[in-house]
Regions:
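Small-residue (G/A/S/T)-rich helix-start motifs and N-terminal tracts that mark the onset
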Residues: 1-80, 88, 182, 193-301
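Short, hydrophobic beta-strand segments that form beta-sheet elements in well-ordered domains
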Residues: 105-109, 157, 185-186, 280-284
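Internal gly/pro-rich beta-alpha loop/helix module
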Residues: 121-123, 128-224
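Short gly/ser/thr-rich secondary-structure transition/capping motifs
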Residues: 104-111, 138, 163-168, 232-237
Length: 301
């Protein structure tokens, strides 16, 4: 699977809208349905949902999810942060739709924010900022993130934890980044998911396929890929019924040193695991008996 930049992800959205064709708000609704189904699979209706939505399209996703969860009899509370008095077009549409749901407790935050009580029975839906963020969170947004991080509530992030950038986080402020238990990434993973320092920020991540156009992804150049099961499966050829070890290649492994036989043993086992027919291993004399006893299939010299 190809990993593309946040800029290319935006272009992927635009390409899908133009070539499916589908409107931006309908594509957002499709994503919201996938997000909602996944949240419902992981957390039942005993959880009190608390949605934190930002002014952009990530916030629009969050508002749509809030509406859909409410329709499934979840208790939902929404905080929309609109400190500049301007929402994206899709966020505004989903706000209008949300207001038609009378069962949702809704607060629009423009200045002062009185945070709700958060316990382990509340599920925080993080929809403050998406992968397009290009600077660290500060001020009020950083304070909100710190408040949520200090709570005992599980957090599910929409697309990416708020405050985490899609690629380079060298100059980011780590204490101002949302720490998610689960991240529901739309269509493709973000490069920052694969850095060990972000493990406790991203948590467990799951990809949600919302039908973005794969032909665009194929045209984008990238240096980063993940290896998927389907790609490996195509490399494994069916074996003939009467085939024998002589039909599957003969490998030579030269490895090991005195007192450090582990790497040579693991390498030999890996060779055999790959399906090779015969394996000859050359090791130092001190490792000969150990190799022969632990990897009896190998021809040891």
């Amino acid at each position: 699977m190809k990993i593309i930049s946040s800029t290319h992800l935006k272009e992927l959205d635009k390409y899908t809208i133009a070539n499916e064709p589908i409107t931006s708000i309908d594509l957002m609704e499709r994503a919201a349905h996938e997000l909602t189904r996944t949240i419902m699979r992981r957390w039942d209706a005993s959880f009190h949902i608390v949605v934190f939505a930002g002014p952009g399209n990530n916030g629009g996703d969050a508002l749509a999810v809030a509406r859909l969860l409410s329709q499934q009899n979840y208790r939902v509370e929404v905080f929309l942060f609109n400190t500049k008095g301007k929402l994206s077009e899709e966020c505004q549409i989903n706000l209008n739709r949300l207001k038609e749901c009378g069962s949702i407790y809704f607060t629009e935050v423009s200045t002062k924010f009185d945070p709700p009580v958060l316990t382990e029975k509340h599920l925080v839906v993080d929809g403050l900022f998406g992968s397009g963020l290009n600077k660290p969170l500060n001020g009020g947004f950083a304070a909100v993130v710190k408040y949520i991080n200090a709570s005992k509530s599980p957090v599910v992030a929409i697309d990416i934890p708020s405050g985490l950038m899609g690629e380079d986080n060298t100059y980011n402020i780590r204490q101002n980044i949302m720490r998610a238990d689960v991240t529901l990434s739309i269509q493709l993973p973000k490069l920052s998911f694969f850095f060990p320092e972000n493990e406790d920020i991203v948590g467990e991540w799951e990809l949600l396929n919302i039908g973005l156009k794969t032909e665009f992804i194929e045209t984008v150049e990238s240096s980063f890929f993940t290896t998927e099961e389907v790609e490996i499966r195509n490399l494994i050829k069916p074996r003939k019924r009467f085939a024998h070890k002589g039909a599957f290649g003969h490998g030579l492994l030269i490895a090991g040193s005195y007192g450090m036989a582990g790497a040579s043993i693991l390498s030999a086992r890996a060779c055999l695991r790959s399906g090779i027919g015969l394996l000859t291993v050359h090791v130092p004399i001190h490792n000969h008996d150990l190799m022969q006893s632990t990897v009896p299939e190998a021809i040891v010299h």
